[in-house]
Amino acid sequence: MIRTLLVFSPAAVSLAAALAFAPVQAGRAAPPAPLDGAALYAKNCARCHSLDANKIGPKHRGVVGRRAGLVPGYAYSPALKASGIVWTPQTLDRWLQGPSAMVPGTKMFFKVADPAQRAAIIGYLAKQK
């Protein structure tokens, strides 16, 4: 009886292991990267808003916790002024889903359909004290 002894280099063993597990790794989706709230704000909001100055829409610094319709120097719609809304993450989320549905008669019409994008924008705004 003849026995054969196979000797493999460490590099060959590492390569074989990597190839053996490659299909397992390929089947796993990488976790999604966190969305960049600042970039989404710039893309979706900055045409009409800024953090520190009123534009077409009111400034946003300090929006979380503020009552709607109170930024000095901005001409709010009567509907938004009378709404009594306090901007929380929850009310901002509802607002961004459809401002006119939340406050009929408001000036704002732009929506953010994607819930993850809304959450990222709201998270960004919450940090802008």
Language-model features: where?
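Hydrophobic alpha-helical segments
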Residues: S14, P34-L35, M102
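Electrostatic cytochrome c docking/interface patches
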Residues: F21-A42
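The canonical Cys-X-X-Cys-His
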Residues: Y41-L51, I121
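Positively charged n-region of N-terminal signal peptides that target proteins for export
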Residues: M1-T4
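Gly/Gly-Pro-rich "capping" loops immediately C-terminal to redox-active cysteine motifs
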Residues: P34-A38, S50, N54-P89, F110-V112
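C-terminal capping alpha-helices of c-type cytochrome domains
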Residues: T88-K129
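Bacterial N-terminal signal peptides
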Residues: S9-A22
